[in-house]
Amino acid sequence: MPTAPFTVLIPARLASSRLPGKPLADIAGLPMVVRVAQRAGLSGATRCVVAADDESIVAACAAHGVAAVLTRSDHASGSDRLAEACELLGLDGDDIVVNVQGDEPLIAPDLIDAVAALLPQQPSASMGTAAHAIDSLADFTNPNVVKVVCDAQGMAHYFSRAPIPFAREHAGQAWWEAASAAASAAPGHPGFAPLRHIGIYSYRAGFLRSFPQLSPAPTEVLEALEQLRALWHGHRIAVHLTPHAPGPGVDTPEDLERVRARLSA
């Protein structure tokens, strides 16, 4: 359990190019954003609040007893939306906030707790996040699976869509065998292992409010990974290594049907 109280904020944007109206998509009788909030409510959070960009999301949350605030519809990112939510909620600068994505209806409550606990455990970190060991070469080479390399203290060196860390002397399956051997030889040093980044974040509210004012990083623009902005500007990101694979998120109609099947079984 976390060593300090924390608030879960769930960004919810009605428009989606691949799945219009995604936050309100029905999953076994409940809007998806309500499902996410209910899962987050099983964590140790003192409160869970949806940061919505449309009145229809706020109304759906209210109908199911979920707290929500209405934010501007012109935010460029979920982080910008949560920064406004911090202001609307009057959070103090040292308050811990966990960003749970609004398309993760199967997120594990204990993962939320673990990511929230990173900041009290690692005072030098501005952000916390999570990662899981990659178990296939296909995932390692898939640009839609974001990788992270960590140092011996569990801080992120870099995030990339490319296969990192790269073994210069090997390729393909030979690389995979070399990486597995290196990870086994140094189990206390997660930087040797290929790790999949999980898109959950913790911040102190003061840092979250300042994040939109940081200039975008060239690496962030190149990789389309917003967390690289923090590293570019010298901030540290602590990484929780979880032994459990993350539950499936919902980005496409096919993803939605898979999650519906799991929750209706």
Swiss-Prot record:
* Signal sequence coordinates: none
SUPFAM superfamilies this protein is in?
Nucleotide-diphospho-sugar transferases
Enzyme class (EC, first level): transferase
Question: Any idea which GO molecular function terms this record carries?
Answer: 3-deoxy-manno-octulosonate cytidylyltransferase activity
Q: Does the keyword Membrane apply?
A: no
Record keywords, A-Z: Cytoplasm, Lipopolysaccharide biosynthesis, Nucleotidyltransferase, Transferase
Question: Belongs to which family?
Answer: Belongs to the KdsB family.
Name of this protein? 3-deoxy-manno-octulosonate cytidylyltransferase
Q: What is the lineage of its organism?
A: Bacteria, Pseudomonadati, Pseudomonadota, Betaproteobacteria, Burkholderiales
